[in-house]
Amino acid sequence: HLDHFEIIVPAFLVVGDTDTDRARWRELARMQVAFYGSTPNYAFIFEQLDHPGTTAALRERQKAGDIAGMATIITDDILRHFTIEGTWATIADGIADRYAGLATRVVNYFGAIAWTEDPQSLARWKPIATALADAP
């Protein structure tokens, strides 16, 4: 039965109390979307988002060795489809809004980076995990 399955979604979570705090995670997410989006199999996703030609543009920059240029192709409009952004006080609501009824678990794609740099940062996620566990 499907009751025994969990759907675990790694998510690009852009979280911080200020825009400056969030900017780093936003740019990491932008680069990841550019990297994944350069794969031809992902072209249809950009087409569905009304951004045809994005994969071709990414591949062109990639072949030229312009990795930084790849990120510039991922506009804020494109990026918002792939990220959940908020403050520490609002990110749980953003996660719930996006994944309620779809995922049984959501994993912060950048969690290992944050933990490696500052093991204490994990404590900030406990109230978020609790809020999500208590969500309907």
What are these model-derived regions, one by one?
Residues 1-136:
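Active-site-adjacent structural elements that line small-molecule/cofactor binding pockets in enzymes
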